[in-house]
Design a protein with these regions (language model features):
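A C-terminal functional module that forms or caps the active site or interfaces directly
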Residues: 1-91
Length: 91
């Protein structure tokens, strides 16, 4: 599958706590926010990544905050895709 570049902005964070903090900031700015976090389940993350980004676009989400997985194995591939999605939406 080609790299999907969502219409919403994608921001990357290291931890769920960082995601919650950033969500609070964005919600206070009247942004519609979704957190993308699979709690360390990289297989589910990989399988659902593009579907969740498309769903965010269809739901009118302004910003997706993605908790990035560890940079090993499948996690590395997910990080690469999220980095590309983030770069494409933060120009």
């Amino acid at each position: 599958e080609k790299h999907y570049a969502p219409n919403c902005r994608v921001e990357l964070v290291e931890t769920a706590a960082d995601a919650k903090r950033r969500q609070s900031e964005l919600v206070s700015e009247n942004q519609k926010v979704q957190i993308l976090d699979f709690l360390g389940d990289v297989v589910s993350y990989a399988n659902q990544l593009y579907a969740r980004l498309r769903q965010a676009d269809q739901s009118g989400i302004d910003v997706v905050i993605a908790v990035i997985p560890i940079n090993v194995g499948l996690g590395e591939a997910i990080r690469d895709r999220l980095t590309k999605a983030s770069a494409a939406t933060n120009l």
